Swiss-Prot record:
Residues 208-222, 229-240, 269-293 have a biased composition (Basic and acidic residues). Keywords: Coiled coil, Nucleus, RNA-binding. It comes from Homo sapiens (Human). The gene is HNRNPCL3. Residues 140-177, 208-293 are annotated as: Disordered. Residues 16-87 form the RRM domain. Its main location: nucleus. Pfam families: RRM_1 (PF00076). One of its GO terms (cellular component) is nucleus. It is found in: Nucleus. Gene3D superfamilies: 3.30.70.330. This is Heterogeneous nuclear ribonucleoprotein C-like 3. Residues 177-208 form a coiled coil. Residues 242-263 have a biased composition (Acidic residues).
Length: 293
């Protein structure tokens, strides 16, 4: 970052120093000024004041290039007025259509701007100011600030500017107070809107969580119901299969009992037949014995 020294009075420093007027220093800072003007050459010093700034280059050609490239440029919604510090502009526009510095960016600029003008006004003499033409009745167009030049005494100018500065400062103080109140109200409204949005988001999140829990519970209940129904079906199936097996076993047992009864009957018949045959043989033997006797 460049130094803050921009008040050297040697001819080389004067010719390589750039004055930047009508600068919105409420927004534009020293780093911003250095970033804008460093593209024209090495910056030896940079100082930012209320409403204006100085940029000190190492070489005069760099300063002239910066004046040619940046004069009349729009910086932070204001058209800047740029010239060499050693060559102030004689006439800075139409006095009938210009806006005061207090209306554009605050009354404190008048004091600092005129101090700079008085600082260099004592070293150089300029022709008297040209009388302004009649004011235009059409739309007022803002133009560059007109610099008052002449061979008047510094005491008279400083006294006049201090009075105008006091009047402008009271007006700007009221304007700033109103602006601060308006900004405060807007910020309060924005905060209320943000709070309401956050509350709505929290409600939506709670509803989503509640719905998710309900869906999860419903799914678990469905799973339990399906599992219990499956178990019931399996149990019924097993009971039906078990009953069929029991009936089959009972049928087998009945068949076995019938078979055993039939076998016993057959054995008894066979025994009866054998017994009858033995009795027949005994009868025949007795008959034969009687015949022999």
């Amino acid at each position: 970052m460049a130094s803050n020294v921009t008040n050297k009075m040697d001819p080389h420093s004067m010719n390589s120093r750039v004055f930047i007027g009508n600068l919105n220093t409420l927004v534009v800072k020293k780093s911003d000024v250095e970033a804008i003007f460093s593209k024209y050459g090495k910056i030896a010093g940079c100082s930012v004041h209320k409403g204006f700034a100085f940029v000190q280059y190492d070489k005069e050609k760099n300063a002239r290039a910066a004046v040619a490239g940046e004069d009349g440029r729009m910086i932070a919604s204001q058209v800047v007025d740029i010239n060499l510090a050693a060559e102030p502009k004689v006439n800075r526009g139409n006095a009938g259509v210009k806006r005061s510095a207090a209306e554009m960016y605050g009354s404190s600029f008048d004091l600092d701007y005129n101090l700079q003008r008085d600082y260099y006004g004592g070293m150089y003499s300029f022709p008297a100011r040209v009388p302004p033409p009649p004011p235009i009745a059409l739309a007022v167009v803002p133009s560059k600030r007109q610099r008052i030049s002449g061979n008047t005494s510094r005491r008279g100018k400083s006294g006049f500017n201090s009075k105008s500065g006091k009047r402008g400062s009271s007006k700007s103080g009221k304007l700033k107070g109103d602006d601060l109140q308006a900004i405060k109200q807007e910020l309060t409204q924005i905060k209320q809107k943000v709070d309401s949005l956050l509350e709505n988001l929290e409600k939506i999140e709670k509803e989503h969580c509640k719905q998710g829990v309900e869906v999860k519970n419903a799914k678990s209940e469905e799973e339990q119901t399906s599992s219990s129904s499956k178990k019931d079906k399996t149990h019924v199936k097993m009971e039906s299969e078990g009953g069929a097996d029991d009936s089959v076993e009972e049928g087998d047992l009945l068949c076995d009992d019938d078979n055993e009864d039939q076998g016993d009957n057959q054995l008894e018949l066979i025994k009866d037949d054998e017994k009858g045959a033995e009795e027949g043989e005994d009868d025949r033997d007795r008959a034969n014995g009687q015949d022999d006797s």
